[in-house]
Structures are given as structure tokens and as C-alpha cells.
Design a protein with these regions (language model features):
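Acidic, contiguous N-terminal accessory segments
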Residues: 1-129
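Residue-level preference for nonpolar/small residues embedded in alpha-helices
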Residues: 39-42, 149, 203, 279
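Feature activates predominantly on carbohydrate-active enzymes
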Residues: 78-266, 273
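Active-site loop/helix belt of alpha/beta enzymes
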Residues: 268-283
Length: 283
């Protein structure tokens, strides 16, 4: 296996901070797993992609453990991990489930597959993110994107250790998040592109859960006071007016309830002429 399958260096993206390739490779037909809880489930999902059976008494082992500290990590230590691959086994050490999850994504990239064969490149890796926030913004306000496609995007982002999915939900063209208190926002007549397309409250909560499963933080954005033509069509009030701000405060209460499991709500404030100096401080 080590010859034809490992003739070239694996492509690792992003490149780990410290990566030493060895001459070993890991390719047993059976393996024992040492891990618990959520991490075991993630690990089993990866192993199901390979032609390998899980046998508790196998002499080949893959072990994932959470530790209090990893040495030699200068920043963002909560997402750091150490990964060791030899001919006898694989060891992952991290201080958090998120760090261990990133290690498993690296393990995926180290794996070469050819028919019913596979081989994992031997190495010693110590890795941590250079940036605390590694984000991707998806604008669904202008163009609705199906839940299935959004989930595919999030899954791909997590494979490359992107940890923030910024969800731009409102635009001049449409207000894409369901509102129970102001249903006119979702009326087709108030959307200038892809009318009638929006995300239900349950779908929004579902996407938050999906992001969490993939160690990605979802940050919802309700853009204000610019990019708000859809709001104006629905209410006939500018967001910066007294009436508009009163409506927005009620809407923000509703939006915060929808996204109660996430720590941030983005309010935009870009590309607009401010006519009300109290708008941003109040909102």
C-alpha cells in the first residue's frame, strides 16, 4: 500500500502549523477505537468511509483524548490539536471537541483511497488556527438557496476548518426569515426576486443545529438601516423613522428568540446614509 498510494504528498488545506511526514503509513483492515461520546460518533463516521472494520480487540488502534493543555501552542489553543499517525495506530490529542474535530478533518485529507484499498500517510502534526474567526458569508437575501445546498456548503466549510457561517438573511430584494408577528415581510408581493422563498423559523433553528454538529458558528444577519427596501415595501416606513425603529425592536426580539442558541446577531449598518444619529446606539 505504501508505494502506489503514497507516491505523493497529501494535499493539506490549510497547511498545519507543524507537519513532519514520516515513512510510515497506516492501512489495516481492522481497527480498535478508543473514544467516547460525540467524538466517537464523528470518528465512526470517518471510518465508515474506509474499507476497514471496527474490532475492539484489534492491535491497530485509533485513540482520541481530550487533555487540559497542549504544549507549544502560541494562540487559539482551544482549537489546537496534535495528530500522530504510525503503522500501528493513530493518536489525536486536543483540549476541546472542536480541536479533535479539526484533527479528524486533517486525517481525512491524509487518507488516500484506491478502490478497496486505503492508506493514511504517517506523520506528526501539531496544529492551531492562525485566525480566531475564519468565516464565510452567504447572501440569501438577494437569492434564496435551498436548505440542502446550505448544508452541503457548511459541511464543505467544516472540512477545511472554517468556523463561522455568516447568514445574510435580509436585503433590498427580500426578507428571507419567517416572521410570525409581521407575516407581511414574507409576502410574495414584498419580494422583488424569487418571491415566496424564505426560511421558516424551524428551518433556521435546524441550520443552527447543523452548524453546531460541524463545529461551525452560525451568525445571522438582519441588515439595517440600509439594504432594507423589502422592509419599506412591507411597512411603508424607513427603518430610521420613529415608526420603523419601533417595528424593528419588536422584530429583533423575535429574531433573538429564533436564534437563542447563538451568541451573536449581526445588524449590518453598511452602505447607508444615516439620517437618525440615535439609530445604531438604540438598536
Amino acid at each position: 500500500y505504501s508505494g502506489p498510494l503514497m507516491a505523493r504528498n497529501p494535499v493539506l488545506l490549510p497547511l498545519p502549523q507543524k507537519y513532519v511526514r514520516t515513512n510510515a503509513s497506516f492501512h489495516p483492515k481492522e481497527i480498535a477505537v478508543s473514544s467516547e461520546g460525540k467524538l466517537r460518533s464523528i470518528l465512526m463516521e470517518f471510518l465508515e468511509e474506509l474499507p476497514v472494520s471496527v474490532q475492539p480487540d484489534s492491535r491497530y488502534k485509533i485513540e482520541v483524548s481530550l487533555v487540559d493543555k497542549l504544549d507549544g501552542i502560541p494562540l487559539n489553543s482551544e482549537e489546537a490539536y496534535q495528530l500522530s499517525v504510525s503503522s500501528r495506530g493513530i493518536t489525536i490529542r486536543a483540549v476541546s471537541e472542536q480541536g479533535a474535530y479539526w484533527a479528524i478533518q486533517t486525517l481525512r485529507q491524509l487518507t488516500e483511497r484506491q478502490g478497496k484499498r486505503y492508506s493514511i500517510q504517517g506523520c506528526e502534526i501539531t496544529d492551531w488556527p492562525a485566525f480566531r474567526i475564519r468565516g464565510f458569508m452567504q447572501d440569501v437575501g438577494r437569492s434564496y438557496i435551498s436548505m440542502e445546498e446550505l448544508k452541503r456548503e457548511i459541511e464543505v466549510l467544516s472540512r477545511y476548518k472554517m468556523n463561522v457561517f455568516h447568514w445574510h438573511l435580509t436585503e433590498n430584494q427580500a426578507w428571507r426569515l419567517e416572521s410570525k408577528i409581521f407575516p407581511m415581510l414574507n409576502d410574495s408581493c414584498n419580494m422583488s426576486r424569487m418571491p415566496g422563498k424564505y426560511y421558516t423559523i424551524e428551518e433556521a433553528k435546524e441550520l443552527v443545529r447543523f452548524c453546531k454538529e460541524h463545529n461551525v458558528l452560525l451568525i445571522p444577519e438582519v441588515d439595517m438601516p440600509g439594504h432594507s427596501a423589502a422592509f419599506i415595501r412591507a411597512f411603508r416606513h424607513d427603518m430610521q423613522s420613529k415608526e420603523g425603529m419601533a417595528i424593528l425592536k419588536l422584530l429583533m426580539d423575535e429574531v433573538c428568540e429564533v436564534f437563542e442558541e447563538v451568541p451573536y446577531l449581526h445588524i449590518g449598518t453598511d452602505e447607508v446614509k444615516f439620517t437618525n444619529p440615535k439609530f445604531v446606539p438604540e438598536m
